[in-house]
Each structure stands twice: as structure tokens, then as C-alpha cells.
Amino acid sequence: MAIAENYEDVLKGKYPAKAHAKKVAEWIIAKGGDKNGTIYLEAQKQKLNEDNDGEAPFRQRRYFFYLSGCELPDSYLTYEIATEKLTLFIPPVEPDEVIWSGLPMSPEDAKAKYDIDHCLTTKDVNAHLTSTSESAQSTIYAIPEQVSDHVTFISYKEKEFKQLKPAIEYCRVTKSDYEIALIRKANMISTAAHEAVMKAASTAKNECELEAVFLKACVERNAKNQAYHSIVAAGEHAATLHYVHNAAPISDQNLLLLDAGCEVDCYASDITRTFPLKGKFTAESLAIYKIVLDMQHQCINALKEGVVWDSVHELAHKVAIKGLLELGILKGDAEEIFTKRISVAFFPHGLGHYLGMDTHDTGGNANYADKDVMFRYLRTRGSLPERSVITVEPGVYFCRFIIEPYLKDEEKKKYIDESVLERYWSVGGVRIEDNVLVTKNGFENLTPTPKEIDDITKLILST
């Protein structure tokens, strides 16, 4: 059976906060940290919108959530490394707030819900910190600028602000069964939303209508937060990688690119599908779609523990070059085109990134200053560990802003046939993106959203 395949059963348990805390502590100790230290983290504070009394949208601080599983704002936690005790501090009852919002979660309720040893109120935090520092503990680990002014570490011998954040970022790369279950659930809900958009596409008059269809499908499944701003791009708008206007009329455009995903309990999905709005590809859009689908299939099939992501990214470019040569858009020697980075004109972004609590999750070690343009925007570098989740999102785009400088360059333009290229501008762009779990000997694709040509066209035409 696949890992966390029955995700609803897995999610009946508690989020594994203590296992995460122990994992982080072990990383700190392995780097020479204090085995008698204490970890301290704070939740995001509830804030008001500027110049009015309305609450700003709340997004839990991911570092805090990773060691608590707690979605409550204005909370704190401590983890005593030697005793492995995890203590959560939640806001006390404020009578004025109860009038408006009802009774908050009690410490008893929190103890039952979360994977913690103790739960106190935030009023108790300084007394608790003093008591732990007076025992064997000597070092407090925290994240700079994420400690409230009234919280004091004065009784600790050492205050360490450099190790905790990278420790959590490293540990977040490899996922527990519970985390994989959350990502699976987010993918299932987002798949239903993508399918709803495909079914509604043929009658839509504006991109915003289809964005609304996606959001409705998520919210009615109790996924009220999106992992990122949806991209709903018809026709040539899809040539813009992060097009977010989602408000243009839909008329005679052939393709729609939908890059959208909900989150479930702070864990993201990130799915892209490109499909013909009326259910039928043009010859040009079909040719490009087949290239991108081949890019994705080959790259996913290359995944397993230890594979070097840079090499998989190179594979995507080589598949793209082969396909564009066959269409006549590119001309010349494939190896020469690869070496001179001509394919970057059509595939300018990285193949994918780690996925977890953030859409672009931690631990990727990107190098945005890389002088090699092929790798500059590759958000994940190096080898992929078992239980990491990576997006695989190849694309081919016809963006005038990106391609035209190549056409004006005497050395580069000889590899591009402008007369053939002219037929493809209207395609805009094609991207296909799945969320893939890396396993010891291969992979598990967590994204069941239709993408094969027959599957998507039948779905669109079924309405």
C-alpha cells in the first residue's frame, strides 16, 4: 500500500508535534548544540488591518506549527530537549472577547487535541522559562525577531538565535505519514476543484468565473484557504508564469492554464493543468501539450531517493529540445542548443520545488545568483531524500518579452526558426504540475488530477 494512502484514517490521529520536535533537537545536537537546551517558538499574532478594527487574514507561523500542530494565534511553546517535554501556552480567557467570539479553547481541550505534554496559558510563560532554566538546561534556542518583548530569557546562560530556524527548515524536507496524508487530502480536494473548472470552462465568459468555480469547490469541501494566489490564464496570458489578474474576457482562446491548489491544516497542494476551453486542441496547442506531457512523464519516472534534481531539470530541457526540433521551432544540433541554453527561451523556470507547509517549501538551497541561466530559477538543488515531496512542473511558453531578445541576438537566433515560431504565439503557454513523493526506489504521485489528453477532453466535453 502507498504511504498514507488511506489519508483519512491517518488523520484521525494527532499531528506528530513531539516527533518533529525531537527531530529538530537531534539536528541541533548533531551540530554541536546543547543537549540540555530548551526550544522556544511563538505563533503568529492576530493583527488588525491598518487604520481599522477589522482582523487581517490570519496565517499561522509555519515554524511554530511544525512543533505544535496548533493553529491558534498568539500562542507559545517550549520543548525541553533532555526530558522531551513539549509545553504549549495558549491565550487565556478574555471576558470581552467571549462576548464577541465565544469561549476559546481551554488548556484541557488543547491537551486532548494536540500532541503535547502540558498546556498552560500565555500568562505562565515567563515563570515556566525560569523554572526550566534553573534545572539542567542552559541554552535557549529561538528565532530572531520572533520573541515577544515581554518574554524574558534572562535566566538562561546562553541565548542561541542562529540554529533553530535552519534546523526546522532542514527537518521539514522529509515528511511523516501524517504530513503526507495532509498533502494527499489537499490534492484530492484540489483535484475536485480542477475538474469542476474543466467542466465549467466551455461556457465561461471571463477568467474570473473559473477562478470562482475553483474557490467554491474548495470551500464547500472545507478547504477555506488557498496555498497561493490562483493563476487562471486564457490564451496568451499563459505565457506569463505568475499571471494573477484572472479577469480577462474569454472568447476565442484555445487553452486555459490553471495553476491552483488549496491547503489543508497548513499543508499545501500545488497543481497546474492546461486544457482546451472547448474540449478540442488546435494542431499547434496539441503539439506543445504532447511535448510538455512527455517532459513530465520522463522526469517523474526518473525520481527516486538520491536522484540529483539538477539532472532531472536538465532532462526536462533535453526532452523539450527534442520536441521543439521535431516541430521545427528549433533548428540545429540538439547538444549545441542545450549547451548554449537556447531552450531557456521557451522553458525559463525551474522544474519544481519542495512542497509542504509552504508552496515553495524550505530546504531547497536555491542559488538565484547562479550565472548559468538554466539553473538560476531552480528552487531546489542537490539530491532528493526519501520522503521529500517535490513538484514536477515542466512547461513550454511563447512569451515575446523572453523570446524576442534571442531573436535579436546574432549567435542565438540561428537556432530558432521565426517563420515556424509565428504559428505558436497564440498557444501562450503549457504547464503541467504534479506533487510527487520521493521513495527509496521510486516515487508516488500524490496528484490524481486528469492530465492525459483523452481524459481531459472527455471531461470537458461531458458537460
UniProtKB/Swiss-Prot annotation:
<feature type="binding site">
    <location>
        <position position="433"/>
    </location>
    <ligand>
        <name>Mn(2+) 2</name>
    </ligand>
</feature>
<dbReference type="InterPro" id="IPR029149">
    <property type="entry name" value="Creatin/AminoP/Spt16_N"/>
</dbReference>
<dbReference type="InterPro" id="IPR007865">
    <property type="entry name" value="Aminopep_P_N"/>
</dbReference>
<dbReference type="GO" id="GO:0030145">
    <property type="term" value="F:manganese ion binding"/>
</dbReference>
<comment type="function">
    <text>Catalyzes the removal of a penultimate prolyl residue from the N-termini of peptides.</text>
</comment>
<dbReference type="Pfam" id="PF05195">
    <property type="entry name" value="AMP_N"/>
</dbReference>
<dbReference type="Pfam" id="PF00557">
    <property type="entry name" value="Peptidase_M24"/>
</dbReference>
<keyword id="KW-0031">Aminopeptidase</keyword>
<feature type="binding site">
    <location>
        <position position="270"/>
    </location>
    <ligand>
        <name>Mn(2+) 1</name>
    </ligand>
</feature>
<dbReference type="GO" id="GO:0070006">
    <property type="term" value="F:metalloaminopeptidase activity"/>
</dbReference>
<feature type="binding site">
    <location>
        <position position="270"/>
    </location>
    <ligand>
        <name>Mn(2+) 2</name>
    </ligand>
</feature>
<dbReference type="InterPro" id="IPR052433">
    <property type="entry name" value="X-Pro_dipept-like"/>
</dbReference>
<keyword id="KW-0479">Metal-binding</keyword>
<keyword id="KW-0464">Manganese</keyword>
<dbReference type="InterPro" id="IPR000994">
    <property type="entry name" value="Pept_M24"/>
</dbReference>
<dbReference type="InterPro" id="IPR036005">
    <property type="entry name" value="Creatinase/aminopeptidase-like"/>
</dbReference>
<protein>
    <recommendedName>
        <fullName>Probable Xaa-Pro aminopeptidase pepP</fullName>
        <ecNumber>3.4.11.9</ecNumber>
    </recommendedName>
</protein>
<keyword id="KW-0482">Metalloprotease</keyword>
<keyword id="KW-0378">Hydrolase</keyword>
<comment type="similarity">
    <text>Belongs to the peptidase M24B family.</text>
</comment>
<feature type="binding site">
    <location>
        <position position="393"/>
    </location>
    <ligand>
        <name>Mn(2+) 1</name>
    </ligand>
</feature>
<keyword id="KW-0645">Protease</keyword>
<feature type="binding site">
    <location>
        <position position="259"/>
    </location>
    <ligand>
        <name>Mn(2+) 2</name>
    </ligand>
</feature>
<feature type="binding site">
    <location>
        <position position="433"/>
    </location>
    <ligand>
        <name>Mn(2+) 1</name>
    </ligand>
</feature>
<dbReference type="GO" id="GO:0006508">
    <property type="term" value="P:proteolysis"/>
</dbReference>
